[in-house]
């Protein structure tokens, strides 16, 4: 079982509030988010749907499948949700770490500036494009 990410947690926090969402077909739904699932399936109550041609219609309840949602507009009050405070603490520890974070050992062999070995023999036995070295 995988844990849900912060965007899905924020979506669950928006339950009971007015949200606006647009589907991939271009309809815009505005209503009270009754229920949201981890796969972004949403149930809206007291909804106004605006179709692509500009017509609008009032609906009591509507269920929208999660993979048909293009984007959602959530209430501004969710900016103060506790999940964002936890993210802020986690990012403070990562400032200045670069892309890889703390542990960079063992992440590759760094062969960009090493001389080529030849045909795979041990070091010193062959040179690229030439005969083996002779030390006599």
Swiss-Prot record:
GO terms for biological process: spliceosomal snRNP assembly. GO terms for cellular component: catalytic step 2 spliceosome; commitment complex; cytosol; P granule; precatalytic spliceosome; SMN-Sm protein complex; spliceosomal tri-snRNP complex; U1 snRNP. GO terms for molecular function: RNA binding. Residues 6-78 form the Sm domain. It comes from the Eukaryota. Residues 98-136 are annotated as: Disordered. The keyword Transcription regulation does not apply. Its main location: nucleus. It is found in: Nucleus; Cytoplasm, Cytosol. Keywords: Cytoplasm, mRNA processing, mRNA splicing, Nucleus, Ribonucleoprotein, Spliceosome. Belongs to the snRNP core protein family. Plays a role in pre-mRNA splicing as a core component of the spliceosomal U1, U2, U4 and U5 small nuclear ribonucleoproteins (snRNPs), the building blocks of the spliceosome. PANTHER family: SMALL NUCLEAR RIBONUCLEOPROTEIN SM. This is Small nuclear ribonucleoprotein Sm D3. It comes from Caenorhabditis elegans. The lineage of its organism: Eukaryota, Metazoa, Ecdysozoa, Nematoda, Chromadorea. The gene is snr-1.
């Amino acid at each position: 079982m995988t844990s849900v990410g912060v965007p899905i947690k924020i979506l669950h926090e928006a339950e009971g509030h007015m949200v606006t969402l647009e589907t991939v077909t271009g309809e815009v739904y505005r209503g009270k988010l009754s229920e949201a699932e981890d796969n972004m399936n949403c149930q809206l109550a007291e909804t106004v749907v605006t179709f692509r041609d500009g017509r609008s219609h009032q609906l009591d309840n509507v269920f929208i499948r999660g993979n048909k949602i293009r984007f959602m507009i959530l209430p501004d009050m969710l900016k103060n949700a506790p999940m964002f405070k936890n993210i802020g603490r986690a990012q403070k520890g990562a400032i200045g770490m670069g892309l890889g974070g703390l542990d960079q050992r063992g992440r590759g062999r760094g062969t960009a500036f090493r001389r080529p070995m030849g045909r795979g023999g041990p070091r010193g036995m062959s040179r690229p494009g030439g005969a083996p070295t002779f030390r006599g």
